[in-house]
Amino acid sequence: MGQFTVVSLGLLAMFLSLSGAKGDNCPASWISRNGVCNKLFPDRKTWLEAEMYCRALKPGCHLASLHRDSDSTVLAWYISDHFKGAGHVWIGLRDTNRKRTWKWSDRTSTNYFSWNQGEPNNVQDDENCVHLWAPSGYLKWNDEPCASLHPFICQYKL
């Protein structure tokens, strides 16, 4: 009887600890990284159309924000492995005030940048949105006119 009680209490404790834990489960077509879910959408949209599409998917969903090299690497592998020839891919960074002050659409901090060499260059004073640059293997960023059409990555926190 004593062993049964110990096992039962152990299972109860495990159940209670797991029931309060946040799972790291993204829907089947999304990838998980560092507590967020990401998905690439191959439809070509403007930056604003892409951001609005992400927001309509789920509360708290936005174009992807990247905050460290490991975030960039995981998404680069994902895009390269599953979407060959996708072209450049929108992320959630843009210069809303046209003053070279870059902000994420999810309002998280902008303490990490992975610009391609010579970027951001704001060609013709019209490059205020950011995409993952395909020739860099999606590891580097480029500023681009927001009206350009690209696939995009949506992201939400678990």
From Swiss-Prot:
Query: What Pfam families does UniProt report for this protein, alphabetically?
Result: Lectin_C
Q: Which residues form the signal peptide?
A: 1-23
Q: Does the keyword Disulfide bond apply?
A: yes
Compartmental location: Secreted
- MF (Gene Ontology): carbohydrate binding; metal ion binding; toxin activity
Q: Which residues form the C-type lectin domain?
A: 33-155
Question: What residues bind Ca(2+), as annotated?
Answer: E127, N142, D143
Q: Which Gene3D superfamilies match?
A: Mannose-Binding Protein A, subunit A
Entry superkingdom: Eukaryota
Q: Which SUPFAM superfamilies match?
A: C-type lectin-like (SSF56436)
Its keywords, alphabetically, are: Calcium, Disulfide bond, Hemagglutinin, Lectin, Metal-binding, Secreted, Signal, Toxin
Main subcellular location = secreted
Q: Which GO terms describe its cellular component?
A: extracellular region
Q: Where is this motif: Mannose-binding?
A: 119-121
The record's tissue-specificity note reads: Expressed by the venom gland.
Which residues form each disulfide bond in the chain?
C26-C37, C54-C154, C129-C146
What this protein is reported to do is described as: Mannose-binding lectin which recognizes specific carbohydrate structures and agglutinates a variety of animal cells by binding to cell-surface glycoproteins and glycolipids. May be a calcium-dependent lectin.
In the record, the note on similarity to other proteins reads: Belongs to the true venom lectin family.
Q: Can you say what this protein is called?
A: C-type lectin lectoxin-Enh4
